[in-house]
């Protein structure tokens, strides 16, 4: 199911066949420095992806999607919306493979996703959680019109599979506060 298209990207639901390309993107340690990694065992990731497709997309009607280059058909990253209990609005998350960073793809994708969420889902409030050392994501949030609200701790998973609590800056976006 295609969510949106931009000049350079197709934003669509993930398919099981996309998992090998995700491992290529996540193989660079700089990609997982600020986010949870994929499962170490690709078979586990495939099972997780099947369940995600069935349960998350089917129940919520949104989730994390893949970013596919319209020119090459390659998966260049992921971005999407997720429900985060205890926080206002949907969480906007994003990740790009290293070769695709600093080329405007994240802004292009996230702008389209926000527009989709506002128009198709009727969602007016969004949040994003960014590590204070992730300067590129901070710049992206600010360029998208998000404003820093406060610091918060969230549980996550390290590359070795252990649970960890990390501190993030919570950024917020309210469509009603934006000029048309």
Regions flagged by a language model, labelled:
Residues 53-54, 157:
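Short beta-turn/strand-loop junction motif enriched in small, turn-promoting residues
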Residues 54-55, 92:
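Short, well-ordered strand-loop elements centered on a beta-strand within folded domains, enriched
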Residues 1-33, 66-180:
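Acyl-donor (CoA/ACP) binding surface of acyl/acetyltransferases
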Residues 30-53, 62-63:
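Conserved GNAT-fold acetyl-CoA-binding loop/helix
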């Amino acid at each position: 199911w295609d969510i949106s298209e931009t000049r350079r990207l197709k934003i669509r639901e993930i398919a099981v066949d996309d998992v090998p390309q995700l491992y290529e993107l996540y193989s660079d340690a700089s990609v997982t420095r600020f986010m949870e990694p994929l499962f170490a065992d690709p078979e586990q990731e495939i099972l997780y992806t099947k369940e995600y497709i069935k349960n998350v997309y089917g129940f919520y009607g949104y989730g994390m999607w893949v970013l596919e280059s319209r020119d090459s058909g390659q998966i260049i990253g992921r971005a999407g919306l997720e429900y985060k209990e205890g926080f206002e609005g949907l969480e906007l998350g994003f990740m790009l493979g290293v070769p695709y960073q600093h080329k405007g793809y994240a802004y292009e994708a996230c702008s389209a996703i926000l527009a989709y969420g506002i128009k198709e889902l009727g969602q007016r409030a969004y949040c994003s959680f960014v590590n204070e050392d992730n300067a590129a994501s901070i710049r992206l949030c600010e360029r998208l019109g998000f404003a820093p609200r406060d610091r918060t701790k969230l549980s996550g998973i390290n590359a070795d599979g252990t649970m960890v609590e990390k501190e993030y800056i919570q950024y917020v976006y309210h469509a009603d506060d934006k000029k048309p």
